[in-house]
Amino acid sequence: MCAALKRCAYRHKGKIMENTNIVTTEQQAPNTISASNAIFNVQALGQLTAFANLMADSQVTVPAHLAGKPADCMAIVMQAMQWGMNPYAVAQKTHLVNGVLGYEAQLVNAVIASSSAIHGRFHYRYGGDWERCTRTQEITRDKNGKNGKYTVTERVRGWTDEDEIGLFVQVGAILRGESEITWGEPLYLSGVVTRNSPLWVSNPKQQIAYLGVKYWARLYCPEVILGVYSPDEVEQR
């Protein structure tokens, strides 16, 4: 084969390889298509459905409220896809409260912190003497179960409502395109009514910081956690 034909064949082969790569990329639609558009893409929807079915078959790596429920797993898959996270990791951070799916505060905090809505990390200002809310105590309670009454030991707070007065956290972050920190309003511990997590007893500063981040995000970047609620918020609804 003459040199000219060889060059022509090489260029033609390069185009075929290039086209093949394009097709391969298009076949990986779920990796590049947005979650909101996935339901309108037949190929992407089929792959997501197959993954949701596989996820629902799991008995160990997904919580009991998702096992055997492909439709619910599909919602988790699409939410994880929107956040760019592992669906199994997201599933482990969910809870069923009053028939509504709730996401753990830790997950919601991570989603907001890793989003493109803010630059860098969140900043926190604590006010008041938080040393007043570091004491805990153990109590025993009688509960009724299927096999009758039984006694449980619980750790509860060792401080009073008066000790919480004046304690607050203020959350702030640098919004995308800005250079200064945008601070939210102070969130007072005495104003937090629903406290489902035991961490409100052992680590109230962390829990109120999580709550402050959610309040800040709902005000300044609501699109990041639209339709996502923590168990504490679900119980209030």
Locate the predicted segments by residue.
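Short, Lys/Arg-enriched N-terminal segments with co-localized hydrophobic residues
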Residues: 1-16
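Polyanion-binding surfaces on beta-sheet-dominated domains and ring/shell assemblies
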Residues: 13-237
